[in-house]
Amino acid sequence: MTEAATSLKRTLVGRVVSSKMDKTVTVLVENRVKHPLYGKYVVRSKKYHAHDEANQYKEGDRVEIVESRPISRTKAWVVSRLVEAARVI
């Protein structure tokens, strides 16, 4: 194999909706799926708890999360990078 090994870990992009916990953020990931019968695109969403070691991400930030080993009962994702900072109005 001369090619570089690809990462088998899943990555998702979502929006931080809560950063109140210590070293943890709640990330809302939205997916558009086509309804099997009617053909309309519907938004499906799910929340993930992700590890934020430095407490540097705040509500409204778009972040990329990567699947990891279980860190706690509900946390098995780690924030890998900031995609877009929250807009200040």
Swiss-Prot record:
Keyword annotations from UniProtKB, A to Z: Ribonucleoprotein, Ribosomal protein, RNA-binding, rRNA-binding
Pfam families: Ribosomal_S17
Alphabetized PROSITE patterns for the sequence: RIBOSOMAL_S17 (PS00056)
Claim: Ribonucleoprotein is one of the keywords in the record: yes
Self-association and partners: Part of the 30S ribosomal subunit.
NCBIfam families linked to this entry: PRK05610.1, uS17_bact
Function: One of the primary rRNA binding proteins, it binds specifically to the 5'-end of 16S ribosomal RNA.
Protein name: Small ribosomal subunit protein uS17
